[in-house]
Curated annotation (Swiss-Prot):
InterPro entries in alphabetical order: BRCT_dom (IPR001357), BRCT_dom_sf (IPR036420), DisA/LigA_HHH (IPR041663), DNA_ligase (IPR001679), DNA_ligase_CS (IPR033136), DNAligase_adenylation (IPR013839), DNAligase_N (IPR013840), Hlx-hairpin-Hlx_DNA-bd_motif (IPR003583)
Keyword set, alphabetical order: DNA damage, DNA repair, DNA replication, Ligase, Magnesium, Manganese, Metal-binding, NAD, Zinc
UniProt biased composition (Low complexity): 755-767
Native organism: Nitratidesulfovibrio vulgaris (strain ATCC 29579 / DSM 644 / CCUG 34227 / NCIMB 8303 / VKM B-1760 / Hildenborough)
Protein name per UniProt: DNA ligase
Top enzyme category: ligase
Residues noted as binding NAD(+) in the record, renumbered to the chain: 67-71, 116-117, 147, 170, 207, 327, 351
Length: 799
């Protein structure tokens, strides 16, 4: 297959999304120092924390920390991985785009990955980015196209022959949620493109936003109707697009602003633009609105001047923005620079400093979490910060209060950076009147009056009473939450009401509730009560070992560690018997985590809870595993230790479910095709990952064969052995013919398509003959030593 770089035919060079091939990063000297255990544990904790906050922000729209706090965690992890490169792995948040796709809406793979952007917060960091760019491409042009960085929901709208056909949220960058019906109601989205020169197929990428004035009116209507108020325009936009009832979406003041394209299929010829500014002009001609204030800057210095000027008047703009996106204007230079594992090397987000406001610190209240940690919360005189009313802010711990020198009654500086939870920056000492009072951290729990302790080496104070009402309440809420057992339809407010009323004293109590029990509560009718009971019963019978371990709330055990434990122990009995030495032999489990697990199982109250869970049938074993041998804690799994990657559109289950099944069989999930990959599982239209795997001689297995292998419990692949049955050469060639290289956006001419078109979304018999799918010559196929045949379709990579 040939690629077109801004109209010139060159040798095919698929996007290489493996981090080790990052040309810009390759200039950094390798570090081989021994990794201290503290650094290893801190990196593991940072990865778990960042993944959790990614999910809260991108998927659930309920962030718990500010952008500035997230950036600080992210940069700390980058620093550790830079200092000790062996800490970096493919699952690190620094190597990925985003988080996982929510259930509830249909999922669909993006034809081409929707990448994230790297960030800069200072002129020095902008200069460092420019230097890296010129190191990688010395003759790179100096002009950049600049847009405001909008604070909305990123998605992709797709047009066939000029007519709107579908829309996908960005999701995790590779798979998004189908929101076609909702986007059809967005008034400024063209349902048909203008002009005669529209592409045969085009994927337009942009942001769904709500203007500030429209947001105020929306919240006023919500308030008048007694509905829930939105925290900010981004949450309102994201929630509106994800509505299953499109009449609700139609009533929301949404706008779609286009900033780029994915795949483009032309009737003939080459792309009608050679610059990003030219692309933006063409998008406007086709009928799209584009971000306001977009501008072509002739040099990096001009970009910085644009950034400063826009930042000075951001409050006067009609939409919420939190920075500037600068993209190298020349598309041929973009193509030459390519991508890292998570972001383009030719674009950068220049973030604005957080928005700030003055207000009074009226009080500091202490809350108790599920692990007994006491967290101080600032109670503020309500103030608007960046268009959102702020009345509370977390202070994290006593040390932060002391370090900032806060006193009750202080005038303080508060900031937020586009998310819900703000930060108290500092007290305005110069405005003190003498009436301010020092805050004294409580010596007793505010919920149960038990003594509070601060363990040596920790910043947190803890309530040591295991029967503390707050600890019990938060533990039960966590047990059924998305971070725990993930019980759909059982809301936090109902659980809190049941616990506070004394009707439920442990997680087990929830599963013993009957429909009649629930109908005694106000606003809990027969249907709601039945749904509540059904949801809990479904969670009880369908729980996986991973989710149960997460639900138990063992300190230092997040979802990734829970997956590791579930992959190595048959059930909680086996895990309970494991000693600290056995646990520390597992990936990412050090002395602290192992000690926490052992402490959990040494607690009599926890053991009693486990027996009660067993009694109600909530006792899952490791998925697809035979019982462990007598006296053995861990078992050998079909895919134990193998690196597995999924690509293409899966038909049996979603990508997340497939990855969970592979993990349960002992596999490690990879994020890209590298030499260390053991197995690539392909669905429909697998694209560039399949082509790259063939070039590297990596084993390839079709979706149906993979699930058949899991069902049998016997692995058909071993990284140390040759493939048992290779596909006959004739079938291999037929299966590989015209497989599209989809590393980034590309343009094809319609006249070059033969057989089953790669743009065809049909299934069934058509999918069987899809030339982008591998042949069915056996359970596995490989093309070691063979070059994948090139098609004649032309490609152009665009952001």
């Amino acid at each position: 297959m040939t690629e077109v770089k801004t109209g010139r035919v060159v040798d095919d060079a698929p996007v290489n999304d493996a981090p080790e091939n990052n040309a810009a990063e390759a200039t950094s000297p390798a570090r081989h120092d021994a990794i201290p255990e503290e650094a290893r544990q801190r990196a593991a904790q940072l990865r778990a924390d960042l993944e959790r906050h990614n999910r809260l922000y991108y998927e659930l729209d309920t962030p718990e920390i500010s952008d500035a706090e997230y950036d600080a965690l992210y940069r700390e992890l980058v620093g550790l991985e830079t200092r000790w490169p062996a800490l970096r792995d493919e699952a690190s948040p620094t190597q990925r785009v985003g988080g996982e796709v929510l259930e509830g809406l249909e999922k669909q793979a993006h034809t081409l990955r929707m990448y994230s952007l790297d960030n800069a917060f200072s002129r020095d960091e902008w200069g460092a980015f420019i230097q890296r760019m010129y190191n990688a491409l010395p003759d790179a042009p100096s002009a950049f196209w600049c847009d405001p960085k909008m604070d909305g929901l990123a998605l992709e709208v797709i047009y066939e022959n000029g007519v709107f056909t579908s829309a996908l949220t960005r999701g995790n960058g590779e798979v998004g949620e189908v929101v076609t019906a909702a986007m059809r109601t967005v008034r400024n989205l063209p349902l048909a493109l203008r002009g005669d020169d529209v592409p045969r197929r085009i994927e337009v990428r942009g942001e769904v936003v709500i203007a500030k004035a429209d947001f105020e009116q929306l919240n006023a209507r919500q308030s008048a109707a007694g509905g829930k108020l939105f925290a900010n325009p981004r949450n309102a936009a994201a929630g509106s697009v994800r509505q299953l009832d499109t009449t609700v979406t139609a009533g929301r003041p949404l706008q779609f602003l286009a900033y780029g394209v994915g795949q483009v299929v032309l009737e003939g010829g080459t792309a009608p633009w050679t610059t990003h500014s030219g692309l933006m002009a063409r998008l406007r001609e086709w009928g799209f609105d584009t971000p306001p204030e977009g501008r072509l800057c002739a040099s990096p210095d001009e970009v910085w001047a644009y950034y400063e000027a826009l930042g000075a008047r951001r409050e006067s703009l009609a939409i919420e923005i939190d920075g500037v996106v600068a993209k190298l204007d020349d598309t041929e230079a973009q193509e030459a620079l390519g991508f890292t594992a998570r972001a383009p090397r030719w674009a950068l987000a220049l973030k604005f400093p957080a928005m700030q406001a003055r207000t009074r610190l009226d009080d500091i209240r202490v809350q108790v979490g599920r692990t007994g940690v006491l967290t101080p919360v600032a109670i503020l005189e309500p103030v608007r910060v960046g268009g959102v009313e702020v009345s509370r802010a977390t202070l994290h711990n006593e040390d932060e209060i002391r370090a900032k020198g806060l006193m009750l009654g202080d005038m303080v500086l508060v900031q937020r950076a586009g998310d819900v939870i703000p930060e108290v920056v500092r007290p305005l000492v110069e405005e003190r009147t003498g009436d301010e009072r020092p805050f004294v951290f409580p010596e007793n729990c505010p919920e149960c009056d038990s003594p509070v302790v601060r363990p040596q080496g920790e910043v947190a104070h803890r309530c040591v009473n295991v029967m503390c009402p707050a600890v019990r309440r938060q533990s039960i809420i966590h047990f059924v939450s998305k971070a725990g057992l993930d019980v759909r339809g059982v809301g936090e407010r109902w659980v809190q009401q049941l616990v506070d009323g004394g009707h439920v004293t442990s997680p087990v109590g929830l599963f013993l509730l009957t429909k009649l029990d629930l109908m005694r509560f106000e606003r809990m009718g027969p249907t709601s009560a039945a749904n509540f009971v059904t949801a809990l019963d479904a969670a009880r019978t369908g729980a996986t070992l991973v989710r149960l371990i997460c639900a138990l709330g063992i300190r230092h055990v997040g979802e990734q560690t829970a997956r590791t434990l579930a992959a190595n122990f048959t059930d909680l009995d086996a895990l309970r018997e494991a000693d600290a030495e056995t646990l520390q032999q597992l990936p990412d489990i050090g002395p602290e985590v192992a000690g926490s697990i052992r402490s959990f199982f040494a607690n009599e109250g926890n053991l009693e809870l486990l027996e009660r869970l067993r009694a109600i049938g909530l006792w899952p074993k490791r998925q697809d595993a035979p019982p462990a041998s007598e006296g053995a804690d861990a078992i050998v799994l079909p895919l134990q230790g193998l690196k597995v990657l999924f690509t293409g559109s899966l038909t049996r289950v979603g990508r997340t479910e497939a990855e969970d099944m592979a993990r349960a069989a002992g596999a490690n999930i990879a994020s890209s095709v590298t030499k260390s990959l053991d197995l690539l599982v392909v669905g429909g239209k697998p694209g560039s990952k399949l082509e790259k795997a063939r070039k590297l001689g990596i084993r390839v297995m079709e979706e149906a064969d993979f699930f058949a292998m899991l069902a049998s419990g016997v692995a058909s692949v071993d990284a140390s052995e040759a493939v048992a049955e290779e596909t006959p050469p004739s079938q291999e060639a037929a299966g590989a013919e015209d497989a599209p290289s989809q590393g980034a956006a590309h343009v094809r001419t319609a006249s070059d398509e033969t057989g089953s078109a790669s743009g065809d979304d049909s299934r069934g018999a058509a999918a069987e003959n899809d030339p982008a799918r591998p042949a069915r010559g056996g359970a596995m196929s490989t093309a070691e030593g063979e070059d994948v045949p090139r098609g004649r379709a032309e490609q152009l990579k665009l952001f």
